[in-house]
Every structure is written in structure tokens, then in C-alpha cells.
């Protein structure tokens, strides 16, 4: 029997889903222009770093904390995490990019599902109390659909791996088959990252590799670009 609940959430993992992820490299393009990333092996090394740093200590841990807040109807906790996700994202392009993607995802989720939490989140943005973040929206959608937090995080990490790989295929460039081999190679690391997220303390929230942030900042000054961030 098909699990429609999981398929509904997995729809948001489609690299063609119109959240704008295809327009953002989150610093990857800077590494490519500096020739630090130039083939599948160097991209995999960067993708592992991105997965184990930004997606672990920022997005992933935020999702775990937000899910607990949803279970306890703690609206102030959700707003607090939303604020931290925005202000700790120091590079302007990635900060604005995450806000744009979060706004698109929230609006699309509202078009597709009648989720009280997502409707509330959107209203908080209109009241200038929230910025909207894709990781938080994805968590709210999964919670609304009755999906467990472990699966929600797995799907979100997969969505990021898939979309960043497709962007690398265009930018390095790589072949489509090479891109699919990379995604297959990364699946075990997704599970390991999720397990690490559940071992973290809340005090670990926001730890990010300085080199990643510096290259995200440097992207503002690249002369030729195909990505917004």
C-alpha cells in the first residue's frame, strides 16, 4: 500500500518544486570560481562539510527544536528559533535567500494544505513577528501530515543534497549520471547526520564553519554568477 502521508511531504523534496532552491548555491559558486571545487570528488567533500556543519547545527537542530515546540504548543519557542535562524545567518545573500525560500514554501504549503500551524506562521510574518524559514515550514508541514521528526529531517536533508547536487551539475559542470551517483553516495551520510542532530544540545545551535560563511559572504563580490547566493 502506498503511504500517501510520506509522499505528500516528499513532494516538497522535488528539485523542481518552486521554492527557488535552484537559484541558490549557498557559497558553492565561490568555491567553484576559486577552483577549490572542480569535479565530483571535490564537490562531494564540500557537500559533506555543508551537511555536517550548516545543515546539522543550524537547520537540522532547529527542526528538532521546532517539532518539540509544536508538540507542546509553544508559539514563543517557534518564534525564538525563527529569529535565531535569521540573525545568525551572517552572509546577507544566504540570509535573504533563506527568507525568500521560506516565504515561497509557506505560501505553497498554504495553497496545498489546511495547516493551522503554517497559517499561524504566515500570519506572524504579516505581523512582522517572523521572517519565515524553509526548515521551520518543512517541519510544520511534516507535523501537520503526521510524519515523525526523524523522517522529516531525513527528507529535508535529502532535499538539500539533491538540489545542491543539481546546482553543481550545472555550475561545475558535471554529467547528470554523475549527479545521481553523488546523491546515491550521500544517502548514508544523511542518516549519520540525522543521528548526530539528535545527540546535540540546544546550546550547540548555530555553530557553523567559518570558512563556509566567509565564502558565502565573498559570493557578493563575484563578477560572473549564475546563482543568487
UniProtKB/Swiss-Prot annotation:
Cytoplasm in keyword set: yes
Domain of life: Bacteria
Main location: cytoplasm
Assigned keywords, A-Z: Chaperone, Cytoplasm, Nickel insertion
One Gene Ontology term of the molecular function aspect: nickel cation binding
GO cellular component terms given for this protein: cytoplasm
Subcellular location: Cytoplasm
Signal peptide: none
Pfam families reported in the protein's UniProt record: UreF
Physiological role: Required for maturation of urease via the functional incorporation of the urease nickel metallocenter.
Family: Belongs to the UreF family.
Subunit structure: UreD, UreF and UreG form a complex that acts as a GTP-hydrolysis-dependent molecular chaperone, activating the urease apoprotein by helping to assemble the nickel containing metallocenter of UreC. The UreE protein probably delivers the nickel.
Name by which UniProt lists this protein: Urease accessory protein UreF
Gene source species: Staphylococcus aureus (strain NCTC 8325 / PS 47)
Amino acid at each position: 500500500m502506498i503511504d500517501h502521508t510520506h509522499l505528500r511531504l516528499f513532494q516538497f523534496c522535488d528539485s523542481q518544486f518552486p521554492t527557488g532552491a535552484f537559484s541558490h548555491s549557498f557559497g558553492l559558486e565561490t568555491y567553484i570560481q576559486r577552483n577549490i571545487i572542480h569535479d565530483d570528488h571535490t564537490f562531494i567533500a564540500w557537500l559533506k562539510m555543508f551537511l555536517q556543519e550548516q545543515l546539522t547545527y543550524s537547520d537540522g537542530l532547529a527542526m528538532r527544536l521546532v517539532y518539540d515546540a509544536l508538540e507542546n504548543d509553544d508559539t514563543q519557542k517557534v518564534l525564538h528559533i525563527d529569529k535565531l535562524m535569521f540573525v545568525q545567518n551572517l552572509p546577507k545573500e544566504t540570509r535573504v535567500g533563506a527568507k525568500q525560500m521560506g516565504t515561497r514554501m509557506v505560501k505553497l504549503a498554504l495553497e496545498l494544505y489546511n495547516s493551522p500551524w503554517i497559517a499561524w506562521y504566515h500570519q506572524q510574518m504579516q505581523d512582522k513577528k517572523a521572517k519565515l524559514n524553509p526548515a521551520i515550514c518543512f517541519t510544520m508541514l511534516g507535523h501537520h501530515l503526521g510524519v515523525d521528526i526523524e523522517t522529516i529531517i531525513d527528507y529535508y536533508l535529502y532535499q538539500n543534497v539533491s538540489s545542491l547536487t543539481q546546482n553543481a551539475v550545472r555550475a561545475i559542470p558535471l554529467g547528470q549520471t554523475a549527479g545521481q551517483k553523488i546523491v546515491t553516495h550521500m544517502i548514508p551520510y544523511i542518516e549519520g547526520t540525522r543521528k548526530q542532530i539528535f545527540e546535540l544540545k540546544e546550546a550547540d545551535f548555530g555553530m557553523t564553519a567559518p570558512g563556509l560563511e566567509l565564502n558565502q559572504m565573498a559570493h557578493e563580490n563575484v563578477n560572473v554568477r549564475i546563482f543568487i547566493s
